[in-house]
Amino acid sequence: AKANKAPWRGAGIYAAVSTDGGRSFQPEHKLADHSCECCRVTSAIDADGAPLFMWRHVFEPNERDHALARLKPDGTVESVQRATFDRWKVDGCPHHGPSLVVDERGVRHAVWFNQKDGAGRVFYGRLAAGSGISVEGQRQVGGPRAAHADMAVAPGKLAIAWKEFDGERTQLRGLMSADGGDSFSEIALAATDGASDQARVIRRQNQLFVFWRTEKEGFRLFPLP
């Protein structure tokens, strides 16, 4: 693009597949051009074992929504589809990547940050698979200052965690669902008045935890109900 003096937005997304537990990798393949430069990429395993990747994408003319790629066994692209439809027009990277999980029924769940109707928010939704992805059950997560949400699943459980500044302290909060994302109960996990990292929801066997590092309290692990 530079050689041809053509306009170019974002960066390329590449993936490489390992079939021996990470000891070696097949040659990398490009998934797509025009990803948002600084938002993290998330990955998950689809119901049939195929790798999935989700990232913030720059759609024409300048909408920074999200894309979802599904790979073939050799690491080449099977499909790349638009995954969210909030149509946020911004000429810059918001530094908020999504999170994606697939539950035991094969349902894809995602959380992401976007601006919709003029306000920046964290959202949750189920990404219905098919010839074109549709978002089901989209709902706001947290309040107007919610940020950097993450999620994980265990049998019969779906958990979302995020941090949110209340004007004085940064709160760590969570949502739990036992019905596949149809309804949620909110829980307060912790708070800090210092700097903090992005929380991560992790799974060990059938138990879910939230892992959070803060400047004053250090590393902490919170078991979820």
Task: Describe the role of every protein-language-model region.
Residues 1-225:
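Extracellular, repeat-based ectodomains that mediate carbohydrate processing or recognition
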